[in-house]
């Protein structure tokens, strides 16, 4: 679960970049879910919920050009480095 917090004044740009990443990533092999949410309690903060068929699909996704370009391009827009918390569904 990646969390992104925009620098003041960069919220809209980060929002658009995340929507672009969402659109491309949903086409990646093994993608079950890839949805960006805005945090209602922290303006400018976005949370990404993603699900993959296999862990190897996630690993392949992370090596995709669109992901690497996003990660490199978004750095100047962030107030703090983005964090990722791996989640496992309870069965």
Residue spans of the language-model regions?
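Short beta-strand micro-motifs enriched in acidic
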Residues: 37-41
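An amphipathic, aromatic/His-enriched active-site/gating alpha helix that lines ligand/cofactor pockets
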Residues: 20-32, 51-84
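Short amphipathic alpha-helical segment that frequently serves as the phosphate-/nucleotide-binding helix
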Residues: 15-19
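Active-site-flanking beta-strand signature of metal-NTP-handling nucleotidyl enzymes
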Residues: 1-4
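Short, conserved charged micro-motifs
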Residues: 9-14
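Conserved catalytic motifs of the protein kinase core domain
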Residues: 44-45
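Hydrophobic/anchoring residues in structured secondary elements
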Residues: 36, 83-89
């Amino acid at each position: 679960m990646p969390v992104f917090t925009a620098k003041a004044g960069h919220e809209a740009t980060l929002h658009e970049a995340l929507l672009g990443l969402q659109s491309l990533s949903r086409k990646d092999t093994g993608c079950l879910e890839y949805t960006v949410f805005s945090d209602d309690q922290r303006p400018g903060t976005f949370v990404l919920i993603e699900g993959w068929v296999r862990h190897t699909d996630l690993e392949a996704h992370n090596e995709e050009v669109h992901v690497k370009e996003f990660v490199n391009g978004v750095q100047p827009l962030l107030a703090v480095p983005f964090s990722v918390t791996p989640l496992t569904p309870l069965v």
